[in-house]
Structures are given as structure tokens and as C-alpha cells.
Amino acid sequence: MSALLEATGLTRRYGHVTALDDVSVHLAAGERVAVVGESGSGKSTLARLLLALDTPDAGTVALDGRPVRPGSARSTRWFRRRVQTVPQDPGRSFNPRMRVGDAVAEPLACLRVHGDHSARVAELLVAVGLEPDAARRWPHEFSGGQRQRLAIARALAPRPDVLVADEPVSALDVVVRLQVVELLAQLSAAEGLALLVVSHDLGVVQHLCDRVLVLDAGRVVEQGPVGEVFGAPAHPVTARLLDAVPTLAAVVS
Ligand SMILES: Nc1ncnc2c1ncn2[C@@H]1O[C@H](COP(=O)(O)OP(=O)(O)OP(=O)(O)O)[C@@H](O)[C@H]1O
């Protein structure tokens, strides 16, 4: 499969700490990849670099072979139209003084996407399981799970090819978490959207992703299809992560 989003040899240091050390990742159209690892292994650093929100000390991130560097809104517009993100905390990701419809339409205006923005917002609200008239309401009128649906609608507004999300469901309770994971899976399948998801919840990974990449101390120590890696972990870190989730079967069943 040819790569849509491809990172090659990413290294990121913070002072004497090497957060990421020569990491390469590729994501094909429609593919769903998880990044897992213990706390401090470099997952969020990798997500930020893949979103061109941070500059690597070495390595490149490219979309369809075109390299991207963090920079002005104008210089990265082409990239942001196609690579979007969903925030970790839906509670904080909306301006309380902006109606939901305007918030969902915000990327369309910022990224100068042409067309009828109100119609697109109504379509998106329905796609994420909300009523079209939600557009007139305020963020505080929605539950955490509904706000995460709104955040997904906002991310999908410019019709991206890739969603990179760092712990997109960790702020939600278990039942709502599974509903939002289901929504992401369904949208990814329907729109051919590629997903790269950082998650400490291996149940979420198993439910949502095709392939998993295990990070340890900034390096990829294991990767492969989720079933194979979780079924027969080859690296002690993977085994430790799995051991820490005794209720995995219960979470995903
Ligand atoms: N802005 C920063 N300044 C200094 N050190 C940082 C910074 N961001 C990350 N680090 C360090 O880089 C390493 C990787 O951090 P990162 O947040 O990517 O890990 P993570 O796997 O996402 O962790 P967690 O699961 O706890 O969120 C850690 O040692 C962290 O302390």
C-alpha cells in the first residue's frame, strides 16, 4: 500500500531528553493505525510532529510525498485541509461564546474552503449523530460525548483524508467512549478516512485499529497487525501493556 502520510526518521529532543528517536511511520488511505506505549514513551510528541505542530530535530513528515514544515497558517493550509485532529478534552475545545454551528464551520473559514458552510455543518451534525438544529445551540448545552461528536464534526468539515488524534476518547466514560469509537470506525469506513490514534486504552485500539505501533523510550519496538501483536507480543513492553489490562475482553465485548 502506498503511503498517504509518511514520517521518516523523526527525532525530537528536549534538552538532554530524546523524546523520539529515528521513528518512521506510514499511513495508507483508509488505514487505521494505533500508537501505544508507556507514559513518556513519545506518543504525544509523535502526534504533534505528524500534525506539523512541532518541528523535528531530524526527519520529515510528508503528505502524498510533499514535505510539510510547521509554519504560518498560510504555508500549512494545504496540509491542514487534509490532515485534521480531534482533541483529547471535548470540554475545553469549544469557545463557550461561539454557537456550535459557527464552531464546526470554523475550519472551513480558516482554511478558506469554498461552498455553503451552513449546509455542510448541517450534514456533518447528522453524520455524527446529532440533530441539524444543534447548530443554533451553545457548547455548554451538550454532554461530554456529544461535544466529542461535535469536535469530530469540526475535524471532518474540510473533508480531510487523515485524522491524527491523541487520546480522543480518554476523557469520556466507558459507555460513551465505545459509542465515539464506533462513530470513528464508521466514519473512517464510510469516508475512506485514515486514522492515527494515540491511546493508552488497548480495548479502544483493538476495536478501532488495523495496525499498532509500540513505542518505548522514543523508539518503535514492535509493530504489526493488532491481532498479531496483541495475540503474541514480541517485546516485553507490549506484554507489560497487555498485562496491565486484565479486563480487555470485557471492555471491547
Ligand atoms: N515540551 C517538552 N519539554 C520538555 N520535555 C518534554 C516536552 N514534551 C515532552 N517531553 C518529554 O519527552 C518525553 C516524551 O513525552 P510525550 O509526552 O511524547 O510522551 P507520551 O508517551 O505521550 O506520555 P503520556 O502517555 O504520559 O502522555 C517525556 O520524557 C517528556 O517528559
PLM segments and residue spans:
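Helix-to-loop junction immediately C-terminal to a conserved catalytic motif
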Residues: L51
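Conserved ABC ATPase signature
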Residues: W138-F142, Q146
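ABC ATPase NBD coupling module
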Residues: V68-Q84, M98, D102, C110, ...
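ABC ATPase "signature
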Residues: Q223-G224
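Conserved ABC ATPase "signature" region
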Residues: D116-D133, L242-D243
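Conserved ABC transporter NBD signature motif
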Residues: G59-P70
